[in-house]
Regions:
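Membrane-lumen/periplasm interface segments of specific transmembrane helices
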Residues: 32-56, 183-188, 192, 199-285, ...
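Short acidic/glycine- and proline-prone juxtamembrane loop motifs at membrane-interface regions
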Residues: 139-145, 317
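Loop-to-helix entry region of an early transmembrane alpha helix in multi-pass inner-membrane enzymes
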Residues: 81, 85, 93-111, 136, ...
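Start-transfer (signal-anchor) and selected internal transmembrane alpha helices
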Residues: 1-44, 202, 206
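Membrane-interface transmembrane helices that cradle and orient dolichyl/undecaprenyl
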Residues: 153-164, 194
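Transmembrane-helix motifs of polytopic, lipid-linked glycan transferases
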Residues: 89, 100-121, 281-285
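Transmembrane-helix signature of polytopic, membrane-embedded enzymes
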Residues: 99-100, 116-131, 164, 295-299
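Short hydrophobic/aromatic helix or loop-helix immediately within or flanking a transmembrane segment
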Residues: 57-95, 246-254, 308
């Protein structure tokens, strides 16, 4: 028997593997959504809570309020307009805004998992779907839609489709401030990706599109408040996210772990402990990316670690782990 005849069956058996991996990701997406939905229904039935009681808390209140009334509430300008606009658009046919947001996050979580599958294979996509904070990809938070457009922006950039990458990054920049960090990381990728100098300049010029989106929002806030720092001021007054040195930020976070601190919210101790662990994970991912000379990925995670580490305390780092695709 010839070597070609022996090798042929091996090629035929190897072909279905990518399709099987993709099917596994789809099953993981469906399974995790179903599990979270079942848990939510169980809570609603056993504790006599409404859909809004389960899915309409914390930042969701602000997002839905902006979608309904615009920036009418104090400090609501701390939230970028892209997500509320999407919710309002989908709810125009008469769908309740909460359901519109949940529908969007369902679709966006699938799109984000698909991008991760392209970037890192089935293990990366499934790990993202199984992450403890993946619950925020079911409630109407920004994580799902941001990850969808940001991950696909990165995938398109690595495929050298910089026009598409810039358009997706522009959407990301309209959704949350993390879009600024995405643009910074894409700029590093544009400079370090192989090619002549003119090509690198052309890549950078594409990024003027998402930069313009951020500039437009800052300009809009200036027309409302006559302050160029309105967004930072809202973050500081509403969520205690003013600037602090790294050691002050760590000290403020550690103080929450002390016995008796915030006695009316004892669960905060465990949340902030997880925030510290998440910061350590982010630092480790940044260092590993630097060692591997993955400069764009190191920038993407590193600038976020710096931003969180120079805030009053570590807050929302647990959710930000969902954005760190190099992990």
């Amino acid at each position: 028997m010839s070597p070609a005849a022996v090798a042929a069956p091996r090629r035929r058996t190897a072909r279905p593997r990518p399709r099987a991996d993709a099917r596994l990701v789809v099953q993981a997406w469906f399974g995790t959504r179903l599990l979270m939905a079942v848990v939510a229904v169980w809570v609603m039935v056993t504790e006599h809570r409404s859909l809004g009681d389960v899915f309409g808390n914390w930042d969701v209140v602000h997002y839905l309020g902006i979608a309904r009334d615009g920036y009418a509430e104090a400090n609501s300008i701390a939230f970028f307009p892209g997500w509320p606009l999407l919710v309002r658009l989908v709810s125009l046919p008469g769908l309740p805004p909460l359901l519109a947001g949940m529908l969007l996050t369902m679709v966006a979580s699938g799109a984000a998992a698909a991008a991760l599958y392209r970037l890192g294979g089935a293990p990366a996509a499934i790990a993202w779907l199984l992450a403890p904070t993946a619950v925020f990809t079911l409630v109407p938070y920004t994580e799902a839609v941001f990850c969808a457009v940001a991950f696909w922006a990165w995938e398109r950039a690595t495929a050298r489709q910089w026009g598409a990458a810039a358009a997706l990054a522009a959407v990301a920049a309209s959704v949350r401030v993390s879009g600024v960090f995405l643009v910074m990381a894409l700029a590093v990728l544009a400079l370090t990706q192989a090619g002549p100098a003119k090509e690198r300049v052309r890549r950078l010029l594409w990024l003027a599109i998402p930069v313009a989106v951020v500039a437009a929002y800052i300009g809009y806030l200036y027309t409302l408040t006559h302050s160029w720092t309105a967004w930072f001021d809202a973050q500081t007054s509403g969520w205690a996210r003013g600037f602090a040195t790294p050691w002050e930020s760590l000290q403020h976070t550690l103080s929450v772990l002390e016995p008796g601190a915030y006695a009316d919210h004892p669960e905060w101790r465990w949340v902030f402990l997880a925030e510290i662990i998440s910061m350590a994970v982010g630092l480790l991912v940044t260092l590993v990316s630097l060692v591997q000379r993955r400069w764009g990925e190191a920038t993407w995670v590193g600038v976020q670690v710096v931003a969180f580490g120079t805030s009053y305390w570590y807050m929302s780092v647990n959710r930000a782990v969902l954005l760190w695709f190099p992990l």
